[in-house]
Design a protein with these regions (language model features):
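C-terminal outer-membrane/trafficking sorting elements
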Residues: 375-468
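Residues in and immediately flanking transmembrane alpha helices
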Residues: 15-16, 206, 405
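Bacterial N-terminal signal peptides
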Residues: 8-15
């Protein structure tokens, strides 16, 4: 009998150790560090990527959202004022230690909103929960790597092609797959993404209330995800604060997956006979006005369907950024008491993805003559460079060549001798390569001008002479 009891104790200890030991790295997991918001929001000097703190100058520690948590822990107890993330966030430590779907959705509000909207999903209809795809080793940070964001490669291991899911799956007709595996499954199978439109940041700063105009769906931004360089859905978060506007874009999989029928060729390709509002908008004048505030009835309208994230997004992607006109202490509730601040962002963040290239834009029927840059060749340069324009002196036009060794947002501008901006020649995201841009001075007076390039951390200026 003693031997049996001893064996039971041994089995219990072995099981307990096996269960607990992998969690020794929990302190470096994103569920513990909550590093994602810090990385996204903070200035570079404060450990971030130059996020909204650049606009607000309000430290994230004053926002009441660093140690984000649900109203109660998994045991049903309210959180204390001083709180350290731990097991009880997800595990009912006073009973079975089981994790429920509601424990996940208490923090992951975007997914909760999608479910509450009753948007269908093939996985949920089969009884899947968060933990079906997101395994313990991912949630507990078993690899011991302190990720800055869940979008970093390795942070989230769940993917369509994982073993036990759709591993080895190929296009139903691989012999004629026009995309050659360059599209992520969700680009076609996700019905919609979701965004909380235009966060009123004064409410967050002063009263710690999360106030947005409304949650919007029906759209899918398309970007190139840096994790695998595949076309992938993206969403955004926009804010306004004291007359300034900022927006951050990143890859996102809304759990609105359907088996068939989410997206066909004409849902993305205007040149295949499709009628895509965002592409029609762009082809008219080179600008996608994604969302428009209707002053007459205080409502918002926005493009439905796919929205290509264009190469020159800083000048070609606009939306009406809104502010709340009521008191910051007002209860958060649907309201028409909003108005437009501006339609051009003061700050753009594009994280863990890149815009569609000019070539990709052309393939879906976008008028790329509205994008000003032409690549010279397919060679990848080893360093940044800005060449002397030729001819120089010139009349009336000249060519400016430059090289970028890695993808970057590029600005190329011409100034007069007093430093006044004459013309912005380039204002778009470019892949690594060698490029040239034409400058026409037909409407300018003879004289000395300057052209300057800004690409990532690279800046250079050269002189050009217009002689008529």
């Amino acid at each position: 009998m003693k031997r049996i009891n001893l064996l039971l104790v041994v089995f219990f200890l072995v099981g307990f150790v096996a269960e607990v030991f992998p969690q020794q790295n929990f302190s470096t997991s994103l569920h513990s560090t909550r590093q994602g918001k810090i990385h996204w929001y903070n200035k570079v000097e404060n450990g971030g990527v130059g996020g909204f703190e650049v606009l607000t100058n309000v430290p994230i520690t004053q926002l009441g959202c660093v140690e984000c948590h649900d109203a109660v822990d998994a045991n049903g107890n309210q959180y204390p004022a001083n709180y350290t993330p731990g097991c009880v966030d997800c595990h009912a430590t006073n009973s079975t230690w089981a994790v429920t779907q509601s424990d996940c959705l208490g923090c992951h509000g975007r997914e909760r909103a999608i479910i509450n909207m009753q948007l269908p999903d093939v996985h949920r209809s089969l009884g899947f929960t968060c933990m079906t795809c997101h395994k313990e080793e991912e949630l507990h940070g078993d690899d011991g790597i302190a990720y800055n964001s869940m979008f970093e490669p390795g942070a989230i291991q769940a993917d369509c092609s994982n073993s036990g899911c759709h591993a080895g799956f190929t296009h139903p007709n691989p012999g004629v797959d026009p995309h050659g595996g360059k599209l992520h499954c969700t680009s076609c199978h996700a019905q919609t993404n979701l965004a909380c439109y235009s966060c009123h940041f004064e409410s967050q700063v002063q009263t710690h209330l999360k106030r947005t105009y409304k949650q919007i769906t029906g759209f899918v931004f398309l970007v190139n995800r840096t994790k695998d360089n595949k076309v992938h859905p993206a969403t955004f978060q926009a804010i306004t604060y004291e007359g300034k506007a900022g927006v951050a874009f990143g890859p996102s999989v809304a759990h609105t997956i359907v088996k068939t029928g989410a997206r066909t060729c004409t849902d993305c390709h205007q040149n295949f006979g499709g009628q895509i509002p965002a592409i029609t908008d762009f082809n008219a004048d080179g600008v996608i006005k994604f969302a428009t505030w209707n002053t007459a009835d205080s409502t918002l309208s926005w493009h439905q369907g796919i929205v290509p994230f264009p190469a020159n997004y800083q000048t070609s992607l606009k939306m009406d950024y809104l502010t709340y006109n009521g008191n910051v202490s007002d209860p958060v509730a649907p309201s028409k008491n909003w108005s437009v601040v501006k339609d051009v962002a003061d700050l753009f963040q594009v994280l863990y993805c890149t815009p569609l290239t000019k070539q990709q834009m052309a393939k879906i029927g976008m008028d790329t003559t509205l994008v000003s840059v032409e690549p010279i060749n397919n060679n990848i340069p080893s360093s940044f460079a800005l060449e002397q324009n030729y001819p120089n002196p010139f009349n009336p036009s000249t060519t400016i060549r430059y090289s970028i060794p890695k993808s970057a947002y590029v600005e190329l501008k011409v100034y007069d001798g007093l430093g006044n901006l004459v013309q912005a020649l380039v204002n778009e995201y470019l892949s690594a390569g060698n490029y040239e841009t034409k400058f026409n001075g037909a409407n300018l007076s003879s004289g000395v001008y300057y052209y300057q390039i800004n690409a990532g951390e690279f800046t250079a200026t050269k002189k050009l002479v217009l002689m008529k």
